[in-house]
Design a protein with these regions (language model features):
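Glycine-rich catalytic cores of cysteine/serine-nucleophile enzymes that process amide/ester linkages
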Residues: 1-77, 103
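Glutamate identity and glutamate-enriched acidic tracts
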Residues: 9, 55, 64, 82, ...
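Low-complexity, intrinsically disordered regions enriched in charged/polar residues
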Residues: 53, 83-87, 130-134
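A structural motif
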Residues: 72-92
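Activation targets extended, charge/polar-rich intrinsically disordered C-terminal tails
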Residues: 91-172
Length: 172
């Protein structure tokens, strides 16, 4: 499991610019089910919530992969934390994803990413109050020696949204 954060530096009381998303890479020899989608060995899927898309407000799969594939500089100040998951942790992530198909100012991408990450990881992160990508990025960067700057974002599958997942027409 990877937790990605990106933000634009601003001198404002609350910086809401940026995005937070997760990724799961299948490092096994068999297909894995993540959020109801089957991913093949050696491939990855990204997950995040979005409220600024006319097709759906809530859970999205692979839109971040799509964005970075077609616009490599789409996300600035990108950082990530990474955790190797066992079967029980993957089940906990899937349970969290089943409840995550929503978006609001308080249940935004930062709140979503932190909630799922904190479900399975002992290194807890804090998205702030209100939850923002910049606050979560600062929390990630406080995990000294554990975060990576400018990590690669995998692109293996088409874009889906919702739970259960539906193929996106906008990103087809």
């Amino acid at each position: 499991l990877r937790l990605y954060t990106t933000y634009v530096e601003k001198d404002t009381p609350v910086n809401i610019d940026g995005h937070v998303f997760l990724a799961v890479t299948n490092n096994t020899d068999a297909d894995l089910v993540v959020g109801g989608l089957s991913i093949a060995p050696g491939t990855s899927i990204t997950m995040g919530t979005r409220g600024n898309n006319r097709e759906h407000a809530g859970l999205w799969y692979n839109v971040e992969s799509y964005n970075t594939h077609y616009l490599p500089d789409f996300y600035v100040n990108l950082t990530c934390l990474q955790l190797s998951m066992n079967t029980e942790q993957l089940a906990a992530v899937n349970a969290a994803l089943a409840k995550a198909d929503k978006w609001s100012a308080w249940h935004n991408c930062a709140a979503f990413g932190a909630a799922v990450w904190n479900t399975v990881c002992t290194d807890k992160v804090d998205p702030g109050t209100p939850p923002t990508p910049a606050s979560l990025a600062a929390s990630v960067r406080s995990c000294t020696g554990k975060w990576n700057a400018d990590p690669a974002v995998p692109f293996d599958y088409v874009v889906y949204y919702g739970y259960p997942a539906v193929p996106s027409k906008e990103f087809a």
